[in-house]
């Protein structure tokens, strides 16, 4: 098994250093970072200018209303928003009926980042609900009785690992899950998202993530997968959904994280990838865009910034002498300022950018990115930078799985005590024809 425990992370110290210098985004000269279109307007430049104007309004309002600007994470408001979401959703969420394990994961992970305990009765209810989402054929669907799909399977396994109880672990049918993964495996090393569905890098990551957490990796399950992911890296340096496609932050994270799990990071051109992802941080806003010439979006606070710890580790293993020993290779302060000033809904929850509505997806990934930006390294290299008040500090998140590092260790330790299901039987079960049995 490609053990995740080799990727060591830490729990934050009782008190983390607080950044005391003037806010980066409120410097008088910061306006010079805005887009210069050289008097040649395009649809892209017009949309970018609109976003920058909204961001500037937020920065100016913050500067006007705070004689001594101090950033505050509205923890209590976010907690109450998340707590309500676990029990009751409005009809606006009907469109996510096929994403219900995702809602469980987004909310539970947000709560663990805020260091809010999950009541036992809630944990049990989540376990029982996710068990209803599990298919008799293996994997999890987007809701009870729905077809299994790798995306909700990833979300369900992560949610159960966050709960981290024997009850939660026992929900996962590992034998059937392995059979399901084999049914999705393609000859070129890629995976379908679901039976009869599409292939892209997300599926390789989801498969590698759940297989490594639950200890069901077999000798041939990921044969050819690293090579297929490497073919998805394009001339830009990032990774597209499939070979030949445009580089995208979500796909790039999935590709690199899958290769970290498989211990095949060197399959990629890491320097080219580093240049691409660091170029995605917006100079004026401080947040990240998902693709070249796209707008800033709070969710990429994780999908893009989460790549930097993975790249740091991979380049460090190669002995790169240019690596910082105290900071990730992006502007951690600017990202924290964007999230805390521009992405918090006054009523709780976080959002894409000013003018957008809050939702649990953006709450999860904005908080995850904020955690990445606050915490650097481990052990002797531990260095935290927390913008604003000391209470803003979040729990760390594991950049491969995006759950707590302690929950990764706990889950892998638990499942390593169990044997890998007999993969020969799994292959036979997948290839057999029920009509002739």
UniProtKB/Swiss-Prot annotation:
Its cofactor is Zn(2+). Pfam families: Prenyltrans. Keywords: Lipid metabolism, Metal-binding, Phosphoprotein, Prenyltransferase, Repeat, Transferase, Zinc. The modification Phosphoserine is found at residue 432. (2E,6E)-farnesyl diphosphate binds at residues 248-251, 291-294, 300-303. One of its GO terms (biological process) is positive regulation of fibroblast proliferation. Zn(2+) binds at residues 297, 299, 362. InterPro entries: FTB, PGGT1B-like, Prenyltrans, Terpenoid_cyclase/PrenylTrfase. Binds 1 zinc ion per subunit. Gene3D superfamilies: 1.50.10.20. PFTB repeats lie at residues 123-164, 174-215, 222-263, 270-312, 332-374. Transmembrane segments: none annotated. The record marks 102 as: Important for selectivity against geranylgeranyl diphosphate. GO terms for cellular component: microtubule associated complex; protein farnesyltransferase complex. GO terms for molecular function: acetyltransferase activator activity; enzyme binding; geranylgeranyl diphosphate synthase activity; protein farnesyltransferase activity; zinc ion binding. This is Protein farnesyltransferase subunit beta.
